[in-house]
UniProtKB/Swiss-Prot annotation:
It comes from Mus musculus. Residues 13-82 form a coiled coil. Residues 129-158 form the IQ domain. Residues 1-111 are annotated as: Disordered. InterPro entries: IQ_motif_EF-hand-BS, IQCF. Gene3D superfamilies: 1.20.5.190. Pfam families: IQ. It comes from the Eukaryota. Residues 1-12, 39-51, 74-86, 96-111 have a biased composition (Basic and acidic residues). The keyword Repressor does not apply. Residues 29-38, 64-73 have a biased composition (Acidic residues). This is IQ domain-containing protein F3. Keywords: Coiled coil.
Length: 203
């Protein structure tokens, strides 16, 4: 009983410590999310600029390589930030967190809520599983960025091919009309030359 009373006396201080640690974690998580969103926005802006421009093949290939390198750097930065966010709790705080988990599990059992059970199960996941989840999210973001860039490059290539074909057709029509006009002029000149000797013989 005395141990329980000692725990109850220390809980306000420990809760303040745990709350401070949780607030720091939450602030770090928000900062990393904000930085990740800024990186995603920058990459999407670059992909939009790639969509509007139609560079030659070599320049387009260089830009694709640069954007892939930037996407990989962004992925690495996100993974590094997730590693830095992962911090260890002091032993007293861990004990208090475990006690709170036990209390919440008991409360969930008494209420029988599915959401509470799911939340407590997520809290029980080890840190390496949470880190794996963050890595998967970073990989997925990188995949989406690469997919967007690939679609932009394909759109630009399609537009270039269409324009070349339309230009060739237009030039082909013009060439055909010019040849027809010249041929008609040649025919008229040859006819007029034939008529001139005949007309001179009549005079």
């Amino acid at each position: 009983m005395e141990l329980d009373q000692d725990k109850k006396k220390e809980t306000p201080e420990e809760t303040e410590n745990v709350n401070e640690v949780q607030l720091e974690k939450q602030n770090q998580d928000e900062e990393t999310e904000a930085e990740a969103e800024e990186a995603d926005k920058a990459i999407l802006e670059r992909s939009d600029s790639v969509k509007t421009e139609c560079p030659p093949q070599a320049e387009k290939q260089n830009q694709d390589e640069e954007t892939e390198a930037e996407a990989e750097e962004a992925d690495k930065a996100i993974l590094e930030r997730s590693d830095s966010v992962k911090t260890e709790c002091p032993p007293q705080a861990e004990k208090q967190i475990q006690e709170e988990k036990c209390e919440t599990q008991e409360a969930d059992r008494s209420e029988g809520t599915e959401l509470g059970k799911l939340h407590s199960q997520l809290d029980q996941l080890p840190d390496n599983v949470m880190l794996a989840g963050v890595k998967i999210q970073a990989w997925w973001r990188g995949t989406l960025v690469r997919r967007t860039l690939l679609l932009a490059a394909l759109n630009a290539w399609t537009i270039q091919c269409w324009w070349r074909e339309a230009k060739a057709r237009l030039q082909g029509r013009k060439l055909h009309e010019v040849m027809r006009y010249r041929l008609r002029n040649l025919n008229l000149k040859s006819i007029s030359k034939r008529k001139q000797p005949n007309q001179s013989s009549f005079l």
